[in-house]
Amino acid sequence: MKKILLSMVCLMAVLALAAQSTAKKFVLNLTADGESNLTCYLPQNPSGRAVVDCPGGGYSHLALNHEGYDWAEYFNKQGIAFFVLKYRMPHGRYTVPMEDACKAMRTVRDSASVWNINREDVGIMGFSAGGHLASSVSTLAEYDARPNFSILFYPVISMKPKKGHGGSSYNLLGEEGVKDEKLVDHYSTEKQVRRHLTPRAIILLANDDGAVPPVTNGVAYYSRMRQVGNECSMCIYPTGGHGFGFRSTWPYHDQMLSDLTRWLDSFKAPRKDAIRVACIGNSITDGSGIDMATQKGYPAILQNKLGDGYEVKNYGLSARTLLCKGDVPYMKEMGWRDALAFQPNIVVIKLGTNDSKTHNWVHKAEFGKDLQTMVDSLKALPSKPEIYLCSPIPAFKPSWTINDSVIVNGEIPVIKKVAKKNKCGFIDLHSKYTFADLMLDDGIHPNGKGAVKMAEIIYEAISEKK
């Protein structure tokens, strides 16, 4: 009898300890009819991190327990706020789940101060078809709804029925939708990964998954993330099939939790009071030709130099022009919208290299006007950023008809004039970047060591006003 009583006391103590991890649980309707809602679990000791969870179910139903509610204690114990999303089934109305997921992300961010959450540390998690939804929000959503990190369990990634999961494809896109190649490609999220803009991710799946082929789904997403240089990890377990979720009977359950915990511990969110720096530019800012440019391009090096009191983001986009009539205008891209939504405190603009190309410079009369438009958009932001206009670095070779004479005689005088008119800082990269030996073979893009030199020049300019 004493042993039984002792066991009961121990069990009650464990249950009480578990209950302490969650300070508050409640359900919040996202639609007026309650068809979409969030079950919210706020931790006793909040770390500021949050995760919005999208259970799977082939876009026909939701596995709300082992891919939803059962995870609450795991996250709350780490101080992570956890939100299980009940999203509406699409029945061929492919925008419906995305609308619910984006609303959930915005709701969490809008309530950040009340729920003790860092707006810049909100992740998304999804399983199977819910993994497809999570990856869709990660790649297609606008900045305010896009997560800071993604956790994808055995995700459906391809919307091609024979490559992904036929039921998910037909339920999301409909009978006619799966015949529309553009629509299928749009929702095949490995095709929508964007360098610097798609958040870091971890993908977890079993090698023997027979329902959602790993190679054309989870592995394909990882491959694309790695190809563009985004941060991504993958854990493939020997067995487990499809749909193991939080089931403790799965042999690799404890290892999976350990792997996920270590990954979550491997990165920190920016400080809430960090000074936000947006690096706007073309492929030179992007880090074209530098493997893992997200970590080794000039903005990443600038981040290391400035320290954790700053949050530096890379908004470089290859081939883009300042000119709105150029072949690929920067201000028509998601990266530009992201840079504005970031509400930067400091902006570094380095554009003009591609504008010097023969077919773009025919619109030279509008170069100053378009630069002024960009500056005006930034000055109108509530964050009132300090703006630095950079001259392009030298074009050491005339690759792709990029013309250094046009840069020197046509662009730089205009950039200086706009900088003076708007009281912007001017960083003369063209004069200060003299490192022809630190360029790639094309003579246009700096190599890794050249990116370090660029970061040093820009850091020096920013530091003068620190």
Predicted regions and their residues:
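Catalytic nucleophile-loop/oxyanion-hole region of alpha/beta-hydrolase
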Residues: 63-70, 83-119, 248-255
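Primarily recognizes the serine-hydrolase "nucleophile elbow" in alpha/beta-hydrolase
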Residues: 103-168, 184-185, 189
